[in-house]
Regions:
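Conserved NTP-donor binding/palm subdomain of two-metal-ion nucleotidyltransferases/polymerases, i.e.
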Residues: 2-127, 132-275, 286-352
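Ser/Thr/Pro/Gly-rich low-complexity, intrinsically disordered segments
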Residues: 280-282
Length: 352
C-alpha cells in the first residue's frame, strides 16, 4: 500500500474513532483494529483533540487500546489538559467577578462556556479567555488604558494582560467582513447581549459560576465565528467539535429529535425556550441526522426574527454554508473523511 493510501486510511480510522469518542456512534468501530495509534496521536495533537480521543480510549477494551508507553504518555497529556481547564475555570470566575465589581456586565464567549457542553468538561483543550463587556468601546478602553496602558485596540476586542492566562476583552462578540451584514449583526448583538450577560452557569466541582451565552445565541454566534475564520486564520476540528456540541445542546434544549424533523417544514411550528422563539425548516442536505440538519437552522433564525430585509439571510445563504456542512459531515455523518481545504471551488464570496 502506498504512503498516501496509508495516510488516508488512518485519517478515516481517526474520524471513525472520533465519532465514537463524541457519542455520534455507540459501537466501537471495526476499523480500529487496523489503527496506527502513533498516527492517530499525531492527528489528535495537531487538531488539539488529545483529551477528546483519550475520553474514548478509556472506554476501549485492553486489546484495542494503544501500547503501554504511548498510553501512559497520552494519559499524562490528558491530565495536563485537565489541569489547564481547572486553571481556566478558576481564572474565568476571577475575571468575571473583577469586571462585575468594576461595573461591567459580562459574558464569557466560547472557551470554558463551550467546555461545559462536553461529556467531560475537562477533556477540551482550553485556550484563552474571551469575555464580552457591556458599556461600549469608549468606557471599556478607558478602563483598559488605566489598568494596562498602550494596548492595541482592534475592531472587536483588545488584549488585557493582567494575568498569565491570556484575556481578550470584547466590545462586540464578533463581526462580518461585509459592511451591510456586519451592521445587521451588530444591531442584533445590541438587542440580545444584555440577556446573555444575565445567563449564569455553574462550573464543575464547585469552582463557581460564570456568565455564558444561551444556546439560542451560540448556535448563531459560533457558526458566524467559524464562517469568518475560514477566510482568515482557518478552522480546525476543535472548533468544529465545539459547534457540534452547541448543536447537540440546541437540540436538547428545544427538544428536537429525528422524529420532529418533519415538523420543520411547517412554519407554524414554534419552539420556545429561554425567551426565544425558533421556527426552523429542514436543511437542504436532508441527511436525517439531527445535528447535521440543525446546521441549516441559524439562517432561519435570522429570517424569522426579521433581521434581514426581504428575507436575505444574515449569516449566509444555504449555499454559502455548503463548505461548513461538508466539514461538519466528517464528524457526524457516515461517510469517509471530507477534505475541506479548497474553499473557492464552488464559492462566491460577497456575490450579492
Amino acid at each position: 500500500m502506498s504512503l498516501k493510501k496509508c495516510i488516508v486510511k488512518q485519517q478515516k480510522i481517526f474520524f471513525d474513532f472520533l465519532r465514537f469518542c463524541i457519542g455520534s456512534v455507540k459501537e466501537i468501530p471495526d476499523s480500529l483494529k487496523e489503527a496506527d495509534w502513533k498516527e492517530l496521536y499525531a492527528i489528535a495533537q495537531k487538531q488539539a483533540l488529545l483529551g477528546v480521543l483519550f475520553y474514548g480510549i478509556r472506554r476501549l477494551p485492553k486489546e484495542l487500546a494503544p501500547e503501554q508507553k504511548l498510553l501512559m504518555h497520552w494519559m499524562a497529556m490528558a491530565e495536563m489538559i485537565r489541569k489547564q481547564n481547572i486553571k481556566l475555570f478558576q481564572d474565568s470566575v476571577k475575571v468575571c467577578l473583577n469586571f462585575e465589581n468594576e461595573g461591567f456586565a459580562n459574558c464569557i464567549l466560547k472557551g470554558q462556556g463551550n467546555a461545559l457542553l462536553y461529556p467531560d468538561p475537562y477533556m477540551r483543550t482550553p485556550g484563552d479567555i474571551d469575555i464580552y463587556l457591556s458599556g461600549g468601546r469608549k468606557k471599556i478602553m478607558k478602563y483598559v488604558d488605566r489598568v494596562c496602558p498602550n494596548q492595541v485596540m482592534r475592531y472587536h476586542h483588545v488584549d488585557f494582560p493582567v494575568m498569565k492566562t491570556a484575556i481578550e476583552v470584547h466590545f462586540t462578540p464578533s463581526y462580518m467582513f461585509c459592511p451591510i451584514h456586519n451592521r445587521r449583526m451588530q444591531k442584533w448583538f445590541e438587542e440580545v447581549m444584555g440577556e446573555q450577560c444575565k445567563h449564569r452557569a455553574s462550573l464543575p466541582d464547585g469552582y463557581g459560576k460564570i456568565h455564558v451565552p444561551q444556546v439560542s445565541f451560540n448556535v448563531i454566534y459560533i457558526l458566524s465565528h467559524l464562517y469568518r475564520h475560514i477566510f482568515t486564520e482557518g478552522i480546525g476540528l476543535r472548533q468544529l467539535l465545539d459547534y457540534y456540541y452547541v448543536v447537540c445542546d440546541f437540540c436538547k434544549v428545544y427538544q428536537i429529535s429525528s422524529n420532529h424533523l418533519e415538523n420543520f417544514s411547517n412554519p407554524s411550528v414554534s419552539l420556545s425556550k429561554g425567551s426565544s422563539t425558533f421556527s426552523p425548516s429542514p436543511s437542504s442536505s436532508g441527511s436525517g441526522d439531527v445535528a447535521g440538519d440543525a446546521i441549516a437552522l441559524p439562517e432561519f433564525w435570522y429570517r424569522k426574527r426579521s433581521l434581514c430585509p426581504k428575507g436575505l439571510a444574515m449569516i449566509a445563504y444555504a449555499t454559502e454554508l455548503r463548505l461548513f456542512v461538508r466539514c461538519y459531515t466528517a464528524l457526524v455523518g457516515s461517510g469517509a473523511y471530507v477534505r475541506c481545504y479548497s474553499i473557492y471551488d464552488d464559492y462566491y464570496f460577497y456575490r450579492r
